[in-house]
Amino acid sequence: MSERKKTKIVATLGPSTDSPLIIKKMILEGVDVFRINFSHADHSEVENRIKIIREVSEKLQSNTSILADLQGPKLRIGKVEDGISLEPGDLITFQNGETFIGDRQKVYMNYKNFSKDVKPGERVLLDDGKLIFEVISTDKKSIVEAKVIQGGSLKSKKGVNLPNTKLSLPALTEKDVIDAEFAIKQNVDWVALSFVRNSNDIMDLKNLIDQHTVHKIPIIAKIEKPEAIENIDKIISYCDGLMVARGDLGVEIPPAEVPLIQKELVKLAKKARIPVIIATQMMESMIDCLTASRAEVNDVANSVMDGADAVMLSGETSVGKYPVEVIQTMSSIIHSVEHSELITVPQKPPNIRTVRFVTKSICYHAVHIANDVQAKAICTLTNSGYTAFQVSAWRPNSHILVFTSNKRILTQLNLIWGVKAFFYDSFESTDKTVEQINKIAKDKGYVDKGDLLVNLTAMPIIDKGMVNTLRVSIV
Protein backbone atom coordinates (compact mmCIF):
# COMPACT_ATOMS: atom_id res chain seq x y z
CA MET A 1 0.00 0.00 0.00
CA SER A 2 1.51 3.34 -1.02
CA GLU A 3 1.82 6.14 1.51
CA ARG A 4 -0.17 9.21 0.54
CA LYS A 5 -0.33 12.54 2.33
CA LYS A 6 -3.62 13.47 3.97
CA THR A 7 -3.15 17.20 4.52
CA LYS A 8 -4.06 18.98 1.30
CA ILE A 9 -2.07 21.64 -0.57
CA VAL A 10 -3.72 24.71 -2.12
CA ALA A 11 -1.63 26.47 -4.78
CA THR A 12 -2.41 29.90 -6.22
CA LEU A 13 -2.49 30.28 -10.00
CA GLY A 14 -0.51 32.97 -11.80
CA PRO A 15 2.04 33.61 -14.55
CA SER A 16 4.36 30.96 -13.08
CA THR A 17 1.72 28.24 -13.49
CA ASP A 18 0.44 28.95 -17.01
CA SER A 19 2.15 25.95 -18.61
CA PRO A 20 0.20 22.65 -18.77
CA LEU A 21 3.49 20.87 -18.01
CA ILE A 22 3.96 22.92 -14.81
CA ILE A 23 0.36 22.21 -13.77
CA LYS A 24 0.92 18.49 -14.36
CA LYS A 25 4.14 18.47 -12.32
CA MET A 26 2.50 20.40 -9.48
CA ILE A 27 -0.40 17.93 -9.29
CA LEU A 28 1.99 14.98 -9.34
CA GLU A 29 4.05 16.56 -6.55
CA GLY A 30 1.02 17.06 -4.33
CA VAL A 31 -1.28 19.96 -5.30
CA ASP A 32 -4.90 19.12 -4.47
CA VAL A 33 -6.57 22.50 -5.04
CA PHE A 34 -5.74 25.40 -7.36
CA ARG A 35 -6.74 28.87 -6.16
CA ILE A 36 -7.83 31.69 -8.45
CA ASN A 37 -7.01 35.03 -6.82
CA PHE A 38 -9.56 37.46 -8.25
CA SER A 39 -7.54 40.40 -6.94
CA HIS A 40 -5.23 39.76 -9.91
CA ALA A 41 -7.42 37.93 -12.39
CA ASP A 42 -8.42 38.56 -15.98
CA HIS A 43 -11.48 36.49 -16.84
CA SER A 44 -10.15 35.22 -20.17
CA GLU A 45 -6.87 34.17 -18.52
CA VAL A 46 -8.76 32.45 -15.70
CA GLU A 47 -10.98 30.59 -18.16
CA ASN A 48 -7.90 29.30 -19.98
CA ARG A 49 -6.20 28.25 -16.73
CA ILE A 50 -9.30 26.37 -15.57
CA LYS A 51 -9.47 24.59 -18.93
CA ILE A 52 -5.82 23.51 -18.61
CA ILE A 53 -6.31 22.27 -15.03
CA ARG A 54 -9.36 20.21 -15.94
CA GLU A 55 -7.68 18.68 -18.99
CA VAL A 56 -4.54 17.75 -17.03
CA SER A 57 -6.56 16.56 -14.03
CA GLU A 58 -8.69 14.30 -16.21
CA LYS A 59 -5.61 12.71 -17.77
CA LEU A 60 -4.09 12.14 -14.33
CA GLN A 61 -7.45 11.10 -12.77
CA SER A 62 -6.64 13.44 -9.90
CA ASN A 63 -9.99 15.22 -9.24
CA THR A 64 -8.08 18.46 -8.70
CA SER A 65 -10.29 21.10 -7.10
CA ILE A 66 -10.66 24.78 -8.06
CA LEU A 67 -11.15 27.52 -5.46
CA ALA A 68 -12.33 30.99 -6.54
CA ASP A 69 -11.06 33.59 -4.05
CA LEU A 70 -13.03 36.86 -4.29
CA GLN A 71 -11.14 40.09 -3.66
CA GLY A 72 -13.56 41.70 -1.22
CA PRO A 73 -13.52 45.40 -0.29
CA LYS A 74 -10.00 46.75 -0.87
CA LEU A 75 -9.39 50.21 0.57
CA ARG A 76 -6.47 52.06 -1.01
CA ILE A 77 -4.97 55.51 -1.21
CA GLY A 78 -4.36 57.07 -4.62
CA LYS A 79 -1.12 58.00 -6.34
CA VAL A 80 1.32 60.16 -4.38
CA GLU A 81 4.42 62.14 -5.25
CA ASP A 82 7.72 60.27 -5.08
CA GLY A 83 10.06 60.48 -2.12
CA ILE A 84 7.56 61.37 0.62
CA SER A 85 8.51 60.35 4.14
CA LEU A 86 6.22 60.95 7.12
CA GLU A 87 7.35 61.46 10.71
CA PRO A 88 5.45 60.81 13.97
CA GLY A 89 3.36 63.86 14.84
CA ASP A 90 2.87 64.97 11.22
CA LEU A 91 -0.71 65.81 10.22
CA ILE A 92 -2.27 64.50 7.02
CA THR A 93 -5.67 64.72 5.30
CA PHE A 94 -7.45 61.78 3.68
CA GLN A 95 -9.97 62.91 1.06
CA ASN A 96 -12.32 61.09 -1.32
CA GLY A 97 -14.22 62.44 -4.31
CA GLU A 98 -12.29 63.35 -7.45
CA THR A 99 -8.90 61.68 -7.74
CA PHE A 100 -5.71 63.70 -7.33
CA ILE A 101 -1.97 63.18 -6.85
CA GLY A 102 -1.26 63.15 -3.13
CA ASP A 103 1.55 64.88 -1.25
CA ARG A 104 2.77 64.96 2.36
CA GLN A 105 -0.28 67.03 3.45
CA LYS A 106 -3.14 65.33 1.59
CA VAL A 107 -3.84 61.95 -0.05
CA TYR A 108 -6.74 60.51 -2.02
CA MET A 109 -8.83 57.71 -0.45
CA ASN A 110 -10.80 55.40 -2.77
CA TYR A 111 -13.52 54.55 -0.20
CA LYS A 112 -16.36 57.06 -0.49
CA ASN A 113 -17.79 56.40 3.00
CA PHE A 114 -14.42 56.66 4.73
CA SER A 115 -15.23 60.00 6.37
CA LYS A 116 -18.66 58.72 7.50
CA ASP A 117 -17.40 55.45 8.98
CA VAL A 118 -14.31 56.51 10.95
CA LYS A 119 -14.38 58.24 14.34
CA PRO A 120 -11.80 60.32 16.21
CA GLY A 121 -9.36 58.11 18.07
CA GLU A 122 -9.60 55.20 15.62
CA ARG A 123 -6.50 54.00 13.84
CA VAL A 124 -5.76 53.93 10.12
CA LEU A 125 -3.09 51.47 8.97
CA LEU A 126 -1.34 51.88 5.64
CA ASP A 127 0.89 49.55 3.61
CA ASP A 128 0.35 46.39 5.74
CA GLY A 129 0.68 48.39 8.94
CA LYS A 130 4.02 50.00 8.11
CA LEU A 131 2.43 53.44 8.62
CA ILE A 132 -0.03 54.09 11.45
CA PHE A 133 -2.32 57.12 11.79
CA GLU A 134 -4.84 58.23 14.40
CA VAL A 135 -8.04 59.97 13.30
CA ILE A 136 -8.22 63.50 14.73
CA SER A 137 -11.45 64.65 13.09
CA THR A 138 -13.87 63.96 10.25
CA ASP A 139 -16.37 66.21 8.48
CA LYS A 140 -18.54 63.15 7.71
CA LYS A 141 -18.58 64.19 4.04
CA SER A 142 -15.22 63.73 2.36
CA ILE A 143 -12.36 64.85 4.64
CA VAL A 144 -10.59 63.08 7.51
CA GLU A 145 -7.76 64.70 9.46
CA ALA A 146 -5.23 62.31 11.00
CA LYS A 147 -1.97 62.35 12.94
CA VAL A 148 1.02 60.13 12.13
CA ILE A 149 1.73 57.68 14.97
CA GLN A 150 4.27 55.53 13.14
CA GLY A 151 5.98 57.11 10.16
CA GLY A 152 7.77 55.87 7.07
CA SER A 153 7.73 56.12 3.28
CA LEU A 154 4.37 57.08 1.80
CA LYS A 155 3.87 55.18 -1.45
CA SER A 156 1.19 55.15 -4.15
CA LYS A 157 -1.83 52.83 -4.22
CA LYS A 158 -1.07 51.19 -0.87
CA GLY A 159 -3.75 49.26 0.98
CA VAL A 160 -5.61 50.67 3.99
CA ASN A 161 -6.75 48.71 7.06
CA LEU A 162 -9.21 50.02 9.64
CA PRO A 163 -9.00 47.64 12.63
CA ASN A 164 -11.26 49.70 14.93
CA THR A 165 -13.84 50.83 12.38
CA LYS A 166 -17.17 49.20 11.53
CA LEU A 167 -17.34 49.60 7.76
CA SER A 168 -20.61 50.25 5.95
CA LEU A 169 -19.05 48.72 2.82
CA PRO A 170 -20.50 45.26 2.03
CA ALA A 171 -18.14 42.27 2.00
CA LEU A 172 -19.48 41.45 -1.47
CA THR A 173 -18.52 44.36 -3.75
CA GLU A 174 -19.70 45.08 -7.30
CA LYS A 175 -16.48 43.54 -8.60
CA ASP A 176 -17.04 40.47 -6.42
CA VAL A 177 -20.54 39.98 -7.83
CA ILE A 178 -19.18 40.04 -11.39
CA ASP A 179 -16.32 37.69 -10.47
CA ALA A 180 -18.63 35.34 -8.54
CA GLU A 181 -21.08 35.10 -11.45
CA PHE A 182 -18.17 34.29 -13.75
CA ALA A 183 -16.82 31.69 -11.30
CA ILE A 184 -20.25 30.05 -11.03
CA LYS A 185 -20.42 29.74 -14.84
CA GLN A 186 -17.02 28.06 -14.72
CA ASN A 187 -18.39 25.49 -12.24
CA VAL A 188 -15.70 26.15 -9.64
CA ASP A 189 -15.70 23.85 -6.62
CA TRP A 190 -15.37 26.37 -3.78
CA VAL A 191 -15.74 30.14 -3.37
CA ALA A 192 -13.79 32.07 -0.73
CA LEU A 193 -15.22 35.36 0.57
CA SER A 194 -12.70 37.96 1.76
CA PHE A 195 -13.00 40.26 4.79
CA VAL A 196 -16.01 38.45 6.22
CA ARG A 197 -17.36 40.28 9.29
CA ASN A 198 -20.60 38.48 10.12
CA SER A 199 -22.97 35.76 8.93
CA ASN A 200 -24.91 38.23 6.75
CA ASP A 201 -21.86 38.48 4.47
CA ILE A 202 -22.00 34.71 3.95
CA MET A 203 -25.75 34.80 3.30
CA ASP A 204 -25.34 37.50 0.64
CA LEU A 205 -22.96 35.24 -1.29
CA LYS A 206 -25.13 32.15 -0.73
CA ASN A 207 -28.12 34.00 -2.17
CA LEU A 208 -26.08 35.10 -5.20
CA ILE A 209 -24.96 31.52 -5.84
CA ASP A 210 -28.53 30.22 -5.48
CA GLN A 211 -29.72 32.77 -8.06
CA HIS A 212 -27.29 31.45 -10.68
CA THR A 213 -27.08 27.70 -10.16
CA VAL A 214 -29.08 24.81 -8.75
CA HIS A 215 -25.85 23.20 -7.58
CA LYS A 216 -24.38 23.82 -4.15
CA ILE A 217 -21.05 25.65 -4.26
CA PRO A 218 -19.59 25.65 -0.74
CA ILE A 219 -18.32 28.92 0.73
CA ILE A 220 -15.09 29.46 2.64
CA ALA A 221 -15.09 32.40 5.05
CA LYS A 222 -11.73 34.16 5.12
CA ILE A 223 -11.01 35.26 8.67
CA GLU A 224 -8.97 38.47 8.49
CA LYS A 225 -10.94 41.06 10.50
CA PRO A 226 -11.35 41.50 14.29
CA GLU A 227 -15.12 41.59 13.73
CA ALA A 228 -14.95 38.08 12.27
CA ILE A 229 -13.24 36.81 15.41
CA GLU A 230 -16.01 38.36 17.53
CA ASN A 231 -18.73 36.75 15.38
CA ILE A 232 -16.94 33.47 14.65
CA ASP A 233 -19.58 31.10 16.07
CA LYS A 234 -22.33 32.54 13.88
CA ILE A 235 -20.02 32.68 10.84
CA ILE A 236 -19.11 29.01 11.27
CA SER A 237 -22.78 28.03 11.43
CA TYR A 238 -23.36 29.60 7.98
CA CYS A 239 -20.15 28.86 6.05
CA ASP A 240 -18.78 25.57 4.69
CA GLY A 241 -15.12 26.13 5.55
CA LEU A 242 -12.64 28.61 7.04
CA MET A 243 -9.45 30.20 5.80
CA VAL A 244 -7.08 31.69 8.34
CA ALA A 245 -5.86 34.61 6.19
CA ARG A 246 -2.92 35.64 8.33
CA GLY A 247 -1.79 38.53 6.12
CA ASP A 248 -4.53 41.07 6.75
CA LEU A 249 -5.41 39.44 10.08
CA GLY A 250 -1.87 40.13 11.31
CA VAL A 251 -2.24 43.77 10.29
CA GLU A 252 -5.63 44.34 11.89
CA ILE A 253 -4.70 42.67 15.19
CA PRO A 254 -1.30 42.47 16.93
CA PRO A 255 0.78 39.81 15.09
CA ALA A 256 1.63 38.13 18.40
CA GLU A 257 -2.06 37.21 18.80
CA VAL A 258 -2.32 35.43 15.45
CA PRO A 259 -0.78 32.04 16.44
CA LEU A 260 -3.30 31.38 19.21
CA ILE A 261 -6.17 32.62 17.04
CA GLN A 262 -5.02 30.22 14.31
CA LYS A 263 -5.09 27.30 16.75
CA GLU A 264 -8.49 28.30 18.10
CA LEU A 265 -9.97 28.62 14.59
CA VAL A 266 -8.68 25.17 13.65
CA LYS A 267 -10.20 23.76 16.83
CA LEU A 268 -13.58 25.40 16.11
CA ALA A 269 -13.57 24.17 12.51
CA LYS A 270 -12.91 20.61 13.67
CA LYS A 271 -15.74 20.87 16.18
CA ALA A 272 -18.08 22.03 13.39
CA ARG A 273 -16.60 19.39 11.06
CA ILE A 274 -15.80 21.85 8.30
CA PRO A 275 -12.41 22.23 6.56
CA VAL A 276 -9.90 24.91 7.52
CA ILE A 277 -7.08 26.30 5.36
CA ILE A 278 -3.98 28.03 6.78
CA ALA A 279 -2.77 30.75 4.41
CA THR A 280 -0.24 33.54 3.84
CA GLN A 281 3.56 33.67 3.85
CA MET A 282 3.94 29.96 4.53
CA MET A 283 7.03 29.53 2.35
CA GLU A 284 7.53 33.05 1.04
CA SER A 285 11.32 32.85 0.79
CA MET A 286 10.84 30.23 -1.95
CA ILE A 287 9.46 32.89 -4.27
CA ASP A 288 13.10 33.62 -5.11
CA CYS A 289 15.07 30.89 -3.32
CA LEU A 290 15.20 27.11 -3.79
CA THR A 291 15.17 26.41 -0.07
CA ALA A 292 12.69 27.37 2.63
CA SER A 293 13.78 28.99 5.86
CA ARG A 294 13.75 26.91 9.04
CA ALA A 295 10.98 29.14 10.41
CA GLU A 296 8.83 28.46 7.32
CA VAL A 297 9.34 24.71 7.63
CA ASN A 298 8.24 24.94 11.26
CA ASP A 299 5.23 27.07 10.28
CA VAL A 300 3.97 24.50 7.77
CA ALA A 301 4.67 21.63 10.18
CA ASN A 302 2.87 23.32 13.07
CA SER A 303 -0.13 24.13 10.87
CA VAL A 304 -0.36 20.45 9.93
CA MET A 305 0.00 19.41 13.57
CA ASP A 306 -2.66 21.94 14.61
CA GLY A 307 -5.06 19.94 12.44
CA ALA A 308 -5.41 22.07 9.30
CA ASP A 309 -7.15 20.39 6.38
CA ALA A 310 -4.98 22.32 3.96
CA VAL A 311 -1.98 24.63 3.78
CA MET A 312 -1.92 27.31 1.09
CA LEU A 313 0.72 28.89 -1.12
CA SER A 314 0.22 32.33 -2.68
CA GLY A 315 3.07 34.19 -4.37
CA GLU A 316 5.26 31.11 -4.03
CA THR A 317 3.38 29.44 -6.90
CA SER A 318 1.65 32.36 -8.66
CA VAL A 319 4.76 34.45 -9.39
CA GLY A 320 7.58 32.46 -7.78
CA LYS A 321 10.59 31.05 -9.60
CA TYR A 322 10.11 27.52 -8.25
CA PRO A 323 6.40 26.57 -8.32
CA VAL A 324 7.11 22.83 -8.59
CA GLU A 325 9.95 22.72 -6.06
CA VAL A 326 7.92 24.54 -3.41
CA ILE A 327 5.21 21.86 -3.74
CA GLN A 328 7.87 19.16 -3.35
CA THR A 329 9.16 20.86 -0.20
CA MET A 330 5.70 21.34 1.30
CA SER A 331 4.71 17.74 0.55
CA SER A 332 7.91 16.54 2.20
CA ILE A 333 7.14 18.53 5.37
CA ILE A 334 3.58 17.17 5.48
CA HIS A 335 4.78 13.58 5.09
CA SER A 336 7.32 14.10 7.88
CA VAL A 337 4.89 15.28 10.54
CA GLU A 338 1.28 14.35 9.82
CA HIS A 339 1.50 10.90 11.44
CA SER A 340 3.14 12.22 14.61
CA GLU A 341 1.70 10.97 17.90
CA LEU A 342 2.00 14.55 19.16
CA ILE A 343 -0.99 15.56 17.03
CA THR A 344 -4.15 15.76 19.12
CA VAL A 345 -7.35 14.41 17.60
CA PRO A 346 -10.83 15.63 18.63
CA GLN A 347 -12.39 12.95 20.84
CA LYS A 348 -15.77 14.24 21.99
CA PRO A 349 -18.57 12.28 20.30
CA PRO A 350 -21.60 14.03 18.73
CA ASN A 351 -24.35 14.55 21.31
CA ILE A 352 -26.90 16.87 19.70
CA ARG A 353 -29.84 14.91 18.31
CA THR A 354 -30.28 16.47 14.89
CA VAL A 355 -31.81 14.80 11.83
CA ARG A 356 -28.37 13.39 10.99
CA PHE A 357 -27.54 12.27 14.52
CA VAL A 358 -27.36 8.57 13.55
CA THR A 359 -25.06 9.30 10.59
CA LYS A 360 -22.81 11.49 12.75
CA SER A 361 -22.59 8.80 15.41
CA ILE A 362 -21.80 6.07 12.86
CA CYS A 363 -19.03 8.19 11.32
CA TYR A 364 -17.54 8.90 14.75
CA HIS A 365 -17.56 5.24 15.77
CA ALA A 366 -16.33 4.12 12.32
CA VAL A 367 -13.12 6.06 12.90
CA HIS A 368 -12.60 4.57 16.36
CA ILE A 369 -13.30 1.04 15.10
CA ALA A 370 -10.95 1.58 12.14
CA ASN A 371 -8.20 2.74 14.47
CA ASP A 372 -8.91 -0.12 16.88
CA VAL A 373 -8.73 -2.92 14.30
CA GLN A 374 -6.05 -1.10 12.28
CA ALA A 375 -8.22 -0.97 9.17
CA LYS A 376 -6.36 0.38 6.16
CA ALA A 377 -9.34 2.32 4.78
CA ILE A 378 -12.79 3.64 5.58
CA CYS A 379 -14.95 3.34 2.46
CA THR A 380 -18.14 5.37 2.40
CA LEU A 381 -20.89 5.88 -0.14
CA THR A 382 -22.29 9.40 -0.34
CA ASN A 383 -24.43 11.54 -2.59
CA SER A 384 -23.88 14.87 -0.83
CA GLY A 385 -20.37 14.41 0.58
CA TYR A 386 -21.65 14.75 4.15
CA THR A 387 -20.07 11.56 5.49
CA ALA A 388 -16.70 12.57 4.02
CA PHE A 389 -16.72 15.77 6.10
CA GLN A 390 -17.79 13.85 9.20
CA VAL A 391 -15.24 11.04 8.96
CA SER A 392 -12.41 13.40 8.04
CA ALA A 393 -13.01 15.60 11.10
CA TRP A 394 -12.21 12.69 13.44
CA ARG A 395 -8.82 12.20 11.74
CA PRO A 396 -8.63 8.42 11.27
CA ASN A 397 -5.29 6.68 10.77
CA SER A 398 -6.73 4.94 7.71
CA HIS A 399 -7.46 6.31 4.24
CA ILE A 400 -10.88 7.86 3.65
CA LEU A 401 -12.21 6.58 0.33
CA VAL A 402 -15.44 8.15 -0.86
CA PHE A 403 -17.59 6.63 -3.60
CA THR A 404 -20.28 8.74 -5.25
CA SER A 405 -22.44 8.97 -8.34
CA ASN A 406 -22.55 12.77 -7.92
CA LYS A 407 -19.82 14.08 -10.22
CA ARG A 408 -20.14 17.60 -8.75
CA ILE A 409 -18.63 16.56 -5.43
CA LEU A 410 -15.71 14.51 -6.79
CA THR A 411 -13.52 17.58 -7.07
CA GLN A 412 -15.07 19.47 -4.13
CA LEU A 413 -13.99 16.74 -1.73
CA ASN A 414 -10.35 17.03 -2.83
CA LEU A 415 -9.95 19.88 -0.33
CA ILE A 416 -10.97 17.73 2.64
CA TRP A 417 -8.26 16.18 4.84
CA GLY A 418 -7.51 12.55 4.01
CA VAL A 419 -10.32 12.18 1.46
CA LYS A 420 -9.96 10.56 -1.96
CA ALA A 421 -13.14 10.40 -4.04
CA PHE A 422 -14.10 7.98 -6.82
CA PHE A 423 -17.03 7.95 -9.24
CA TYR A 424 -19.28 4.95 -8.61
CA ASP A 425 -22.83 4.46 -9.90
CA SER A 426 -23.51 0.71 -9.70
CA PHE A 427 -26.03 0.22 -6.89
CA GLU A 428 -27.34 -3.36 -7.11
CA SER A 429 -27.25 -4.68 -3.56
CA THR A 430 -25.35 -3.87 -0.39
CA ASP A 431 -23.18 -7.00 -0.61
CA LYS A 432 -22.36 -6.46 -4.29
CA THR A 433 -21.61 -2.77 -3.77
CA VAL A 434 -19.30 -3.41 -0.81
CA GLU A 435 -17.50 -6.08 -2.82
CA GLN A 436 -17.03 -3.73 -5.79
CA ILE A 437 -15.79 -0.70 -3.85
CA ASN A 438 -13.40 -2.87 -1.84
CA LYS A 439 -11.99 -4.14 -5.14
CA ILE A 440 -11.56 -0.54 -6.36
CA ALA A 441 -9.70 0.31 -3.14
CA LYS A 442 -7.36 -2.65 -3.77
CA ASP A 443 -6.89 -1.90 -7.48
CA LYS A 444 -6.01 1.74 -6.70
CA GLY A 445 -3.33 0.63 -4.23
CA TYR A 446 -4.95 1.82 -1.01
CA VAL A 447 -5.30 -1.68 0.47
CA ASP A 448 -3.77 -5.13 -0.01
CA LYS A 449 -5.21 -8.62 0.19
CA GLY A 450 -5.97 -9.53 3.81
CA ASP A 451 -6.35 -5.91 4.98
CA LEU A 452 -9.37 -4.81 6.99
CA LEU A 453 -11.73 -2.08 5.75
CA VAL A 454 -14.63 -0.28 7.37
CA ASN A 455 -17.60 0.19 5.02
CA LEU A 456 -20.30 2.82 5.56
CA THR A 457 -23.52 2.51 3.58
CA ALA A 458 -27.16 3.55 3.58
CA MET A 459 -29.72 0.75 3.47
CA PRO A 460 -31.63 0.20 1.30
CA ILE A 461 -28.68 1.08 -0.92
CA ILE A 462 -30.67 2.10 -4.02
CA ASP A 463 -32.40 4.90 -2.06
CA LYS A 464 -29.08 6.74 -1.52
CA GLY A 465 -30.30 7.95 1.86
CA MET A 466 -28.39 8.82 5.02
CA VAL A 467 -25.66 6.43 6.16
CA ASN A 468 -27.11 4.00 8.69
CA THR A 469 -24.89 0.91 8.41
CA LEU A 470 -21.32 0.13 9.48
CA ARG A 471 -19.55 -3.04 8.38
CA VAL A 472 -16.00 -4.40 8.74
CA SER A 473 -14.68 -6.28 5.68
CA ILE A 474 -11.55 -8.24 4.82
CA VAL A 475 -10.03 -7.72 1.38
Annotate each PLM feature.
Residues 1-475:
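Non-catalytic helical/linker scaffolds that mediate oligomerization, partner binding
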